[in-house]
UniProtKB/Swiss-Prot annotation:
Pfam families according to UniProt: Fumble
Activity regulation as described: Regulated by feedback inhibition by CoA and its thioesters.
Phosphoprotein recorded as keyword: yes
Species for this entry: Homo sapiens
InterPro entries: ATPase_NBD (IPR043129), Type_II_PanK (IPR004567)
Protein name in UniProt: Pantothenate kinase 1
Phosphoserine modification, residue list: S215
Main location, first listed in the record: cytoplasm
Span(s) of short sequence motif Nucleolar localization signal: 218-235
Binding site for acetyl-CoA: S417, S420, R432
GO terms of molecular function: acetyl-CoA binding; ATP binding; pantothenate kinase activity; protein homodimerization activity
Reactions it catalyzes: (R)-pantothenate + ATP = (R)-4'-phosphopantothenate + ADP + H(+)
């Protein structure tokens, strides 16, 4: 019980706390405030240690007594009734920063006595370990009423364990003056019932568990993310995307070292995605998996598997996003790494329809990182890079492997819908030199207008059967032969589509001729710009990449011929097997990097 007793005109007060906390014994605490009187009703000029003669004023102590049934009497520091009335003492708070009061288990008790004053300073009341309730009448309300009794300065000092262990050697600063609190720590009504517990403050009340509404798939995703985080790898599936203006390029890593435990824990939609992507070579009407480009037995981020290369037209992007929503892809991943202009264009659609966030990456950064990685791992035991030997002689021209172990510096020509030309001096040091809007998109668009074809494959197939000299005006059409002064051969193109000014020529050409002339026009323009950039940058290796070169042997041989002929053998045109997928590979590598950074 916490009791406040005043005296001396309200200037003096004593606060006592009595209760049971230690093995059926009664623990009592008192705090006294200095005032004008030495006791409640008057006395010496100042407060001393409670019950200690000649003690210095202000050197107050906090004492704890333990009174049990077997105890024969009480020390001089104990004032009040010895049976049923509790214990009361007066103490002044000395100036000190902390309070720690321990009981040395007198009379069989155990645990730590914690003062309510210290607990109140921290905003709560705590209690030491409790055992059996005390016998009736020991500090409860059924016994004699508690009262404050003035302490005689001349009383003898007791030497009980309570007096020794109750001595506080440091003390503490008194808390701000607050209205008196009444705290009862004993049983009510003198019964054997357990003592009442103080109600906990709201912030200490046990909080009910929040209801869980997550689906099993989301719980599994969380568990897999936690497991993957410990291994510094992202959760499956692993994708990288390059969303271009004409084509979407997608790379997918299929793990081949799945353990029995992983397969058992694998959620159904993850199995469905893996099976769908790896068991088909066509997806819908336009999606294609380039099986011949698959990289096998590859180790990525500590896992062994195969890397698959998939493409589909950008116009089918909304169908792809819808499929991701139907397969509940967001339960496996919340973020996809994507590069290319479409990563910005379709960002909102991914978020609204499929509940997926796109991590947008720079396409030129991804291009370089992906190219260097694929070249470093090789193409299933073969070199990734190659060139054409004897490009000026169609009969002797053949494909040869090229070692790109030391690639710097190189001129990188990315031939997609448009063209970008980069001068690369190291892995992280490059610049965009120039570009042109006349690229693969131009070729396909003109072919669709001129020939009625609908796909890139159709346009290339028609071009392979056509003759561009029926459409273009050549040097020999102007000079009647070579222009020897400047080394121009009569077969060189003087004017692309120059013969189409003549109605007679227009009536005699075929759609295949138009497709071939369109391909030669675009290719010659790119080759001319690349050669000038290589000369300006003083670089002798020109690497051509991009989906404009996919299954496009005509353009590759034309570029090889142009580089070799116009540079008199000083420039070498280089090509790569995975022409247009390097941006998507770079996006996949960024997925691993994001996990490492975390």
């Amino acid at each position: 019980m916490l009791k406040l007793v005043g005296g001396g005109g309200g200037q003096d007060w004593a606060c006592s706390v009595a209760g049971t906390s230690l093995g059926g014994e009664e623990a009592a605490f008192e705090v006294a405030r200095p005032g004008d009187q030495g006791k409640a009703g008057g006395g010496s000029p100042g407060w001393g240690c409670a019950g200690i003669p000649d003690s210095a004023p202000g050197a107050g102590v906090l004492q704890a007594g333990a009174v049990g049934p077997a105890r024969g009497g009480q020390g001089a520091e104990e004032v009040g009734e010895s049976a049923g009335g509790g214990e009361e003492r007066r103490v002044r708070h000395p100036q000190a920063p902390a309070l720690r009061l321990l009981n040395r288990k007198p009379q069989g008790g155990s645990g730590e006595i914690k003062t309510p004053e210290n607990d109140l300073q921290r905003g709560r009341l705590s209690r030491g370990p409790r055992t059996a309730p005390p016998a009736p009448g020991m500090g409860d309300r059924s016994g004699q009423q508690e009262r404050s009794v003035p302490h005689s300065p001349g009383a003898p000092v007791g030497t009980s364990a309570a007096a020794v262990n109750g001595l506080l050697h440091n003390g503490f600063h008194p808390p701000p003056v607050q209205p008196p609190h009444v705290c009862s720590r004993g049983p009510v009504g003198g019964s054997d019932a357990a003592p009442q517990r103080l109600p906990l403050l709201p912030e200490l009340q046990p909080q009910p568990l929040l209801p869980q509404h997550d689906s099993p798939a989301k719980k599994c995703r969380l568990r897999r993310r936690m497991d993957s985080g410990r291994k510094n790898r992202p959760p499956f599936p692993w994708f990288g995307m390059d969303i271009g203006g004409t084509l979407v390029k997608l790379v997918y890593f299929e793990p081949k070292d799945i353990t029995a435990e992983e397969e058992q824990e694998e959620v159904e939609n993850l199995k469905s995605i893996r099976k769908y992507l790896t068991s088909n070579t066509a997806y819908g009407k336009t999606g294609i998996r380039d099986v011949h480009l698959e990289l096998k037995n590859l180790t990525m981020c500590g896992r062994k598997g195969n890397l698959h290369f998939i493409r589909f037209p950008s116009c089918a992007m909304h169908r792809f996003i819808q499929m991701g929503s139907e397969k509940n892809f967001s339960s496996l991943h919340t973020t996809l790494c994507a590069t290319g202009g479409g990563a910005f264009k379709f960002e909102e659609d991914f978020r609204m329809i499929a509940d997926l966030q796109l991590h947008k990456l720079d396409e030129l950064d991804c291009l370089i990182q992906g190219l260097l990685y694929v070249d470093s791992v090789g193409f299933n035991g073969k070199p990734e890079c190659y060139y054409f030997e004897n490009p000026t002689n169609p009969e002797l021209c053949q494909k040869k492997p090229y070692c790109l172990d030391n690639p710097y510096p190189m001129l990188l020509v990315n031939m997609g819908s448009g063209v970008s030309i980069l001068a690369v001096y190291s892995k992280d040091n490059y610049k965009r030199v120039t570009g042109t809007s006349l690229g693969g998109g131009t070729f396909l668009g003109l072919c669709c207008l001129l020939t009625g074809c609908e796909t890139f494959e159709e346009a290339l197939e028609m071009a392979a059967k056509g003759d561009s000299t029926n459409v273009d005006k050549l040097v020999k059409d102007i000079y009647g032969g070579d222009y020897e002064r400047f080394g121009l051969q009569g077969s060189a193109v003087a004017s692309s589509f120059g013969n189409m000014m003549s109605k007679e020529k227009r009536d005699s050409i075929s759609k295949e001729d138009l497709a071939r002339a369109t391909l030669v026009t675009i290719t010659n323009n790119i080759g001319s710009i690349a050669r000038m950039c290589a000369l300006n940058e003083n670089i002798d290796r020109v690497v051509f990449v991009g989906n404009f070169l996919r299954i496009n042997m005509v353009s590759m041989k034309l570029l090889a011929y142009a580089m070799d002929f116009w540079s008199k053998g000083q420039l070498k045109a280089l090509f790569l097997e995975h022409e247009g997928y390097f941006g998507a590979v770079g996006a996949l590598l960024e997925l691993f990097k994001m996990t490492d950074d975390k």
